[in-house]
Amino acid sequence: MEIYLVTGNMNKKEEFLKMMDEELNVEFVNINLEEIQAQDIVEINEHKVKTAYNILKKQDNNKNKKRYVITDDTGLFISKLNNFPGPYIKWMQKALGSKGIADVVSRLDDNTCHAICTYSVYDGKDVHSFKGITNGKIVEPRGNNKFGWDNIFQPESLSKTFGEMTFDEKQNLSPRFKAFVQLKEFLMNEHKKYNNEF
């Protein structure tokens, strides 16, 4: 059983390794994937994981081996902007930066939002998707910006942005971690089933 996480983002790779059980061996592959244009973050990610799986399968001589390919996607959904930018946050971030996004939201009478992260895993037959959601608000930039908009996202009922938190503080709150817990449970169960077959 081989597990591949498709990412070229070193921060995501580092975070994934901190969360993953050592019992599961994960290979990281960097594949440039086209994303479909859609509002549904799960739909986008499921398309992405199938594309990645097919690319990896074509590159491998052993077409019959059991492989699980994982992709992730994240969105920031600003309430007063009808949940825009959602899955288009990376483009908005690229165009405006964190400060620009915070400036836009500061002109609204409501700065609430929610962040969603999805992991999708595909084994060539079935796609399984896992979603984590964290409610919060957009604030002026504070802290580091290791992950895109961390320095402007302040989780509900807290006074720190993700950018001001340590890894451990952020871990239990982040939508990525919430989705990851579900993904890890799924992979551990698949790993047990796979080992019982041999």
From Swiss-Prot:
EC number: 3.6.1.66
Cellular component annotations (GO), alphabetically ordered: cytoplasm
Cofactors, names only: Mg(2+); Mn(2+)
Domain of life: Eukaryota
UniProtKB keywords: Cytoplasm, Hydrolase, Magnesium, Manganese, Metal-binding, Nucleotide metabolism, Nucleotide-binding
Protein name in the entry: Inosine triphosphate pyrophosphatase
Free-text comment on the cofactor: Binds 1 divalent metal cation per subunit; can use either Mg(2+) or Mn(2+).
Enzyme class: hydrolase
